[in-house]
Amino acid sequence: MRLRRKAWARPELESDPKVIYNPMHYKENWQEAFGNNHPVHLELGCGRGQFINQCAELNPHINYIAIDLYDEVLVKALRKINEKALHNVRVIPMNIAKLESIFKHDQIEKIYINFCNPWPSRRHHHKRLTHPQFLSVYKKLMKDHSEIWFKTDDDELFKDSLKYFAEAGFIEKYRTFDLHQSEFTENIKTEYEEKFSNQGVKIKFGIFVVNKGRQN
C-alpha cells in the first residue's frame, strides 16, 4: 500500500511526545519511555490504530508500542490515542526491519502482526513479516514463552506462515482458518478485518509461542 504524502502529517507527529523519533535512546530501558516497568507489547504495522487503541484501553497495565512506516496512518492512530487520553501507548515511525536497533534481547512479551502485506511473488517472500529471517529477530527480542498473535485474510500467507513459525522453532498454541466462527473470545478487530469480514472473507489467526530451547 502506497499512500499519498500529506505535508501536515509529520509536523503533527513531531509535536506529540508520545511519538518517538529516537527509539534507540530507549533500547536498554523502555520503562523510561513509559515511566513504569509494565510489560511491553508491540504491534508491527499498526495502520490507523483501531486495534492498538482498544488493546491499550482494555489493558492499562500493559505498555504498547505501535510501529508503522507511514506518517499518514500514524497520525490517525495518534489522534485515536489522544481522543481516549491513553497514556500506555507510544508510536514509532520506522521500518520494521530495524527492530534490533531499538530493542535488546528478552524485552518484548507479545507481538501482534495484523494483516501485513502478503507479498505473493516468491521473489518477495523474504519481505513478509512472518518470514523466518524476521522471526529469528523477533525470537531474540522476545522473552521466552512469550507469544506472537498473527492475523491475515490471505490463505497462502497463512499456510506459508505456519511453516515459517515451525521452522523458526515456535510452538503453535492455537490456529483457526475462520476466526469469527471460532471459539476464540479475545479477538479485537482491526479496520481491515472489519472490511474483509463484511465482504465474506474468512480471517485466519494463529498464536505462536517463543521457545528458546528449541533450535531453528
Curated annotation (Swiss-Prot):
* One Pfam family in the UniProt entry: Methyltransf_4
Name the cystine pairs: none
* Alphabetical list of CDD domains matching this protein: AdoMet_MTases (cd02440)
Q: Where does substrate bind?
A: 153, 190-193
Q: Mind listing the UniProt keywords for this protein, alphabetically?
A: Methyltransferase, S-adenosyl-L-methionine, Transferase, tRNA processing
Which EC number(s) does UniProt give?
A: 2.1.1.33
Catalytic activity, as annotated: guanosine(46) in tRNA + S-adenosyl-L-methionine = N(7)-methylguanosine(46) in tRNA + S-adenosyl-L-homocysteine
Q: SUPFAM superfamilies from the xrefs?
A: S-adenosyl-L-methionine-dependent methyltransferases
Q: Give the PROSITE patterns listed for this entry.
A: SAM_MT_TRMB (PS51625)
> What Gene3D superfamilies does the record point to?
Vaccinia Virus protein VP39
Q: Where does it sit, as one GO cellular component term?
A: tRNA methyltransferase complex
Q: Name one GO molecular function term.
A: tRNA (guanine(46)-N7)-methyltransferase activity
What the entry lists under InterPro entries is as follows:
SAM-dependent_MTases_sf, tRNA_(Gua-N-7)_MeTrfase_Trmb, tRNA_methyltr_TrmB_bact
Annotated residues that bind S-adenosyl-L-methionine are located at: 43, 68, 95, 117
What pathway annotation does it carry? tRNA modification; N(7)-methylguanine-tRNA biosynthesis
EC class, as a word, reads transferase
As given in the record, the signal peptide range reads none
HAMAP family, alphabetically? tRNA_methyltr_TrmB (MF_01057)
Family statement = Belongs to the class I-like SAM-binding methyltransferase superfamily. TrmB family.
* Main function: Catalyzes the formation of N(7)-methylguanine at position 46 (m7G46) in tRNA.
Record-given protein name? tRNA (guanine-N(7)-)-methyltransferase
* Gene for this chain: trmB
